[in-house]
Amino acid sequence: MVVIRLSRGGSKHRPFFNIVVADKRVRRDGRFIERIGFYNPIAKGGEEGLRIVQDRLTHWIGVGAQASPTVLRLIKQGGATVVAPAAVAAA
């Protein structure tokens, strides 16, 4: 099964997360298929805190990837829309 989840980067006390598509069996920060965005929880001022490539997100959801609860929350926070797999297949 393929999942869309966060992969932690950054240094101690300065977290930075990549939003990645990976096989569910692979460890959190291990090998991934594709990086589709990032989340910086400590972004300040003019820094970009969240970026998700919408067309790649739609593609992976369309082929059956499951997003983690945290990624779903970030998608809603970023204003992106999640299209149900059935809607993508019908199009």
From Swiss-Prot:
<dbReference type="Pfam" id="PF00886">
    <property type="entry name" value="Ribosomal_S16"/>
</dbReference>
<keyword id="KW-0687">Ribonucleoprotein</keyword>
<dbReference type="GO" id="GO:0003735">
    <property type="term" value="F:structural constituent of ribosome"/>
</dbReference>
<keyword id="KW-0689">Ribosomal protein</keyword>
<dbReference type="GO" id="GO:0005737">
    <property type="term" value="C:cytoplasm"/>
</dbReference>
<protein>
    <recommendedName>
        <fullName>Small ribosomal subunit protein bS16</fullName>
    </recommendedName>
</protein>
<dbReference type="GO" id="GO:0006412">
    <property type="term" value="P:translation"/>
</dbReference>
<dbReference type="InterPro" id="IPR000307">
    <property type="entry name" value="Ribosomal_bS16"/>
</dbReference>
<dbReference type="InterPro" id="IPR023803">
    <property type="entry name" value="Ribosomal_bS16_dom_sf"/>
</dbReference>
<comment type="similarity">
    <text>Belongs to the bacterial ribosomal protein bS16 family.</text>
</comment>
<dbReference type="GO" id="GO:0015935">
    <property type="term" value="C:small ribosomal subunit"/>
</dbReference>
